[in-house]
Swiss-Prot record:
Residues 1-14 are cytoplasmic. Its EC number is 2.1.1.-. Glycans are attached at N61, N230, N626. It is found in: Endoplasmic reticulum membrane. Pfam families: Methyltransf_29. InterPro entries: Put_SAM_MeTrfase (IPR004159), SAM-dependent_MTases_sf (IPR029063). One of its GO terms (cellular component) is endoplasmic reticulum membrane. The lineage of its organism: Eukaryota, Viridiplantae, Streptophyta, Embryophyta, Tracheophyta. Keywords: Endoplasmic reticulum, Glycoprotein, Membrane, Methyltransferase, Signal-anchor, Transferase, Transmembrane, Transmembrane helix. Belongs to the methyltransferase superfamily. It comes from the Eukaryota. This is Probable methyltransferase PMT16. One of its GO terms (molecular function) is methyltransferase activity.
């Protein structure tokens, strides 16, 4: 072992002895300190009761109760208790109740120009707070296209038309269902053959005619058979006491509304329809200074057609069957011809029982003729042609928008629409020309894209919306630009696009320019339609729109009235609004839940989707037993 190794070994041993000695001394010092402290005051380490308190500190009395009571005079609010809202069933006699077309209420109004048959809604205190029942035995309607030709008797239990129109082949009753052969007063060979006759006079197949209006539509066979030609018809007729013509149309899956030509404008914008039709509709076109034809002119697009069949057309051959004199019928046709000329319409053709007029593409020539034909005058510029909610019908000619080329009689006033189906997604003329604030062509295209995404998401939430044929009649309660309906254009459905009169922008004209149909509506009032009209209801921000105007339960009860048993609902709105709506729908016996926005859970806007449960009035025997028990 070398010297360096021996020195290192001794150094390590010395360090070990030193460390051990220091540790023993520390332990001894610690133990001595504990012994001394314990000997002087054994409680000192754990108890300061004998010590001097800190300056300014007062020891509380540990036995005194603490007082948490309020010492003010304001009363506490009463405890909040959740009360479930319940809406009882209305009487069975109200199963076809139409609040704004009530027969008893109508008797209070003038019969002049059929004013009494127009909309007359109940006062706020008269509004029913009950659910309209379906008739006993109600069944889900047949799916389209079978529904065009057949409907369940239990759903519309009226046989009056089968007797009254037996020889005209309107409708037949067999066993438990109605059959619709497609006949009509003026088309004994059927609606298809009748439309073929029209198609030989004007082109119905090239896509230029997409929207039509049928005045006094009967059971809407004309509109039903136009659908196969890609023409969507707004059919309307008055509320019948027993015949239920519009109700039959809706059961068939055909667009229709309750309506009448009387003293107020039809609830549609100007320049809406490519074609207007009257087949023995019994409207006195030549009377009242031609006001009814002027209303047709208002809603007819530039270059649109008006078709008239039935009295007085072809009176020379049919006057005996109509049980009217030749002079009377001749005078009626003369009146119609005069009014049509005063509107600058051109008579295209009269062949057999059909007569067709065409509205001019613009008013270049018509303004010149006003120098000779003083009547009717053009309506004033402050008379908005698109205002059509309880708006009085005027005996004046609605002016068409100015055209850029003041010499070309074929230039379409307001802008030309594309042919169907390109028309659906093309930028509408009203948007192109900047007629609506905030809606640019770019905004329109973005809105179209947005609703395609939303409808795709809806179909994931409500599988029945995505099931082909499950729904047929749809209504969009706040349609805006019609994006919801446009996204469903390839499905076998039709959508009633509603633009609320309270909406910031009147966009219904844009919807019609897209080749879709719709109407104006105030959702604080009932819609002009029968109970159980729609299979599906879409409501975008409707309850937010009507906050402070009427109660949400009033809107929900109307939605329940027009929705079929088993029908679907999608409501999108602010989450706070939807929570309240969802609670109210429990009283309607809807089953539903709230889902996240399509963008995700961080959006305040949510989606409530629900289904109306199936229920009807009790069976007749059961109802009698209940009545006996109550008495």
């Amino acid at each position: 072992m070398n010297l360096f190794t021996r020195i290192s070994s001794r150094t390590k041993k010395a360090n070990l002895y030193y460390v051990t000695l220091v540790a023993l001394l520390c332990i001894a010092s610690y133990l001595l300190g504990i012994w001394q402290n314990t000997a002087v005051n054994p409680r000192a380490a754990f108890d300061d009761s004998d010590g001097t308190p800190c300056e300014g500190f007062t020891r509380p009395n540990s036995t005194k109760d603490l007082d948490f009571d309020a010492h003010h005079n304001i009363q506490d609010p009463p405890p909040v208790t959740e009360t479930a809202v319940s809406f009882p069933s209305c009487a069975a006699a109200l199963s076809e109740h139409t609040p704004c077309e009530d027969a008893k209420r109508s008797l209070k109004f003038s019969r002049e120009r059929l004013e009494y048959r127009q909309r007359h809604c109940p006062e706020r205190e008269e509004i029913l707070k009950c659910r309209i029942p379906a008739p006993y035995g109600y069944k889900t309607p047949f799916r389209w296209p079978a529904s065009r030709d057949v409907a369940w008797f239990a759903n519309v239990p009226h046989t009056e038309l089968t007797v009254e129109k037996k020889n005209q082949n309107w409708v037949r009753y067999e066993n438990d269902r109605f059959w619709f052969p497609g006949g009509g007063t003026m088309f004994p060979r059927g609606a298809d053959a009748y439309i073929d006759d029209i198609g030989r006079l004007i082109d119905l197949s090239d896509g230029s005619i997409r929207t039509a209006i049928d005045t006094g539509c009967g059971v809407a066979s004309f509109g039903a058979y136009l659908l196969s030609r890609n023409i969507t018809t707004m059919s309307f007729a008055p509320r019948d006491t027993h015949e239920a013509q519009v109700q039959f149309a809706l059961e068939r899956g055909v667009p229709a509304m309750i309506g009448i030509m009387a003293t107020i404008r039809l609830p549609y914008p100007s320049r809406a329809f490519d074609l207007a039709h009257c087949s023995r509709c019994l409207i006195p076109w030549g009377q009242n200074d031609g006001a009814y034809l002027m209303e047709v002119d208002r809603v007819l697009r530039p270059g649109g057609y008006w078709i008239l069949s039935g009295p007085p057309i072809n009176w020379q051959k049919r006057w005996k069957g109509w049980e009217r004199t030749m002079d009377d019928l001749n005078a009626e046709q003369t009146q119609i011809e005069q009014v049509a000329r005063s509107l600058c319409w051109k008579k295209v053709v009269q062949r057999d029982d059909l007569a067709i007029w065409q509205k001019p593409f613009n008013h270049i020539d018509c303004k010149k003729t006003r120098e000779v034909l003083k009547n009717p005058e053009f309506c004033r510029h402050d008379q908005d042609p698109d205002m059509a909610w309880y708006t009085k019908m005027d005996s004046c000619l609605t002016p068409l928008p100015e055209v850029d080329d003041a010499e070309d009689l074929k230039t379409v006033a307001g802008g030309k629409v594309e042919k169907w189906p390109a028309r659906l997604n093309a930028i509408p003329p009203r948007v192109n020309k900047g007629a609506l604030e905030e809606i640019t062509p770019e905004a329109f295209l973005e809105n179209t894209k947005l609703w395609k995404q939303r409808v795709s998401y809806y179909k994931k939430l409500d599988y029945q919306l995505g099931e082909t044929g499950r729904y047929r009649n749809l209504v969009d309660m706040n349609a805006y630009l019609g994006g919801f309906a446009a996204a469903l254009a390839d499905d076998p459905v039709w959508v009633m696009n509603v633009v609320p009169v309270e909406a910031k922008l009147n966009t219904l004209g844009v919807i019609y320019e897209r080749g879709l149909i719709g109407t104006y509506q105030n959702w604080c009032e009932a819609m002009s339609t029968y109970p159980r009209t729609y299979d599906f209801i879409h409501a975008d921000s409707v309850f937010t729109l009507y906050q402070g105007q009427c109660e949400p339960e009033e809107i929900l009860l109307e939605m329940d009235r027009i929705l079929r048993p088993g029908g679907g609902v999608i409501i999108r709105d602010d989450v706070d609004v939807l929570i309240k709506v969802k609670e109210l729908t429990k009283g309607l016996e809807w089953e539903g839940r709230i889902a996240d926005h399509e963008k995700g859970p961080h959006e305040r806007e949510k989606i409530y989707y629900a289904v109306k449960q199936y229920w009807t009035v009790p069976a007749p025997d059961e109802d009698k037993n209940n009545t006996s028990a109550l008495s």
